């Protein structure tokens, strides 16, 4: 399901019309791909082309051939020849993106998961392809919209990039947007969408993908709809939300280093969060120095976030997933009901639940001299939250 978000689409097209390169950042299930496909429809297929870089990034030669074959936009110079080596293949890919033409106006490429060109760095002569791509796009007459799920990595890549790049963080859905989605599932019930939207929005943290899963479940419940029960069904071993969380969890972990240690830290934070570096290193039984490295790798793939020198899951639904599926035995019905109930209380009644659910502060957790302070973003790029 492609969620229409007109105001966000206007922000992107306004950025394009101003000569900038919008860079859309959002986590798993945030609607990046849906937004790019909607933009392709809005801009028109005659002058825009969506490309999934993650799917195409195999070898430079095969990637070039796949993109040239699939694209409706072609260069005016004629067919792209066969490259002699990997470096030439990547260069011709940049030439192709740079030289595309359209009879209906300036061509626009919508590059999904553009960071995945890093795959080419495994080949001879290609050491800094991400920076090469950014440098070429910055001066290209072609228009581009970029998207990625890796927020921290994009910020680092664009830290010294030209001001033409405009970072746009995809906002979470609000209750009004979820209500519009809900009409597709519970339209036949009086006040159904309006009644369900606030609870669904809070439970999924505004995630379009998770909202769609819950609303699908609610639509099949009949008259007695219960968002918490729908969440419990979705996070069951065979649930759609479980499958999506597992995909996100494993994808991000496999893009980081230290797989086993990182899973250990996520298990610790699933039990109790937020925790500081010293508390995590004690529980992990590793030195603060090693633990600090592990945490930086988790931050790099946006699995954890540090606020005030304390670490917590970036996505609360992933924390619920790890609490349920981080052990050797799948959860039973009673465990799922209990965990989902506790999660729902923190999301639906945060003010009332906070005093009862907040963990007791550690008695002897002195500030660790090895802890790094929070860094303010350093970048010349335009950023919109």
Regions found by a protein language model. Give the residues of each.
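Short, amphipathic alpha-helical interaction segments positioned at domain boundaries
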Residues: 318-346
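Conserved NTP-binding/hydrolysis module of P-loop NTPases
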Residues: 48, 58-80
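Walker A/P-loop nucleotide-binding motif
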Residues: 19-37
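Conserved catalytic segments around the Walker B and adjacent sensor/switch elements
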Residues: 44-56
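Conserved Walker B catalytic segment
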Residues: 89-151, 159-160
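Winged-helix-like regulatory helical subdomains adjacent to P-loop NTPase cores
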Residues: 212-288, 335-340
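Short amphipathic alpha-helical interaction segments
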Residues: 285-300
């Amino acid at each position: 399901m492609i969620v229409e978000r007109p105001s966000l689409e206007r922000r992107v097209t306004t950025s394009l019309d101003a000569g900038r390169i919008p860079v859309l950042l959002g986590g798993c299930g945030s609607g990046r791909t849906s937004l790019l496909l909607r933009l392709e429809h809005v801009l028109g297929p005659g002058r825009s082309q969506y490309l999934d870089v993650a799917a195409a990034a195999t070898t430079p030669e095969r990637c070039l051939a796949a993109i040239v074959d699939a694209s409706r936009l072609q260069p005016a110079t004629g067919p792209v020849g066969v490259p002699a080596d990997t470096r030439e293949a990547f260069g011709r890919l940049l030439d192709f993106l740079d030289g595309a033409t359209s009879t209906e106006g300036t061509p626009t490429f919508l590059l999904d998961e553009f960071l995945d060109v890093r795959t080419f760095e495994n080949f001879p002569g290609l050491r800094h392809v991400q920076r090469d791509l950014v440098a070429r796009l910055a001066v290209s007459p072609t228009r581009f919209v970029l998207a990625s799920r890796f927020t921290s990595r994009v910020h680092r890549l664009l830290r010294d990039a030209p001001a033409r790049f405009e970072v746009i963080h995809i906002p979470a859905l609000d209750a009004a947007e979820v209500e519009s989605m809900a009409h597709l599932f519970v339209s036949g019930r009086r006040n159904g969408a309006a009644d369900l939207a606030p609870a669904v929005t809070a439970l999924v943290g505004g995630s379009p993908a998770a909202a769609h899963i819950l609303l699908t479940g609610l639509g099949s419940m009949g008259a007695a709809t219960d968002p918490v029960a729908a969440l419990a069904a979705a996070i069951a071993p065979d649930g759609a939300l479980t499958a999506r969380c597992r995909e996100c969890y494993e994808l991000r972990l496999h893009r980081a280093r230290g797989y086993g240690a990182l899973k250990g830290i996520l298990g610790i934070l699933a039990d109790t969060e937020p925790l500081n570096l010293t508390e995590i290193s004690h529980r992990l039984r590793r030195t603060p120095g090693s633990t600090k490295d592990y945490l930086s790798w988790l931050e790099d793939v946006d699995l954890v976030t540090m606020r005030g020198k304390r670490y917590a899951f970036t996505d609360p639904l992933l924390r619920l997933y790890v609490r349920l599926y981080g052990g050797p035995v799948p959860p039973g019905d009673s465990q799922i009901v209990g965990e989902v109930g506790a999660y729902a209380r923190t999301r639906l009644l945060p003010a009332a639940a906070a005093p009862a659910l907040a963990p007791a502060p550690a008695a002897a957790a002195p500030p660790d001299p090895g802890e790094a302070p929070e860094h303010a973003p350093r970048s010349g790029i335009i950023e919109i939250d």
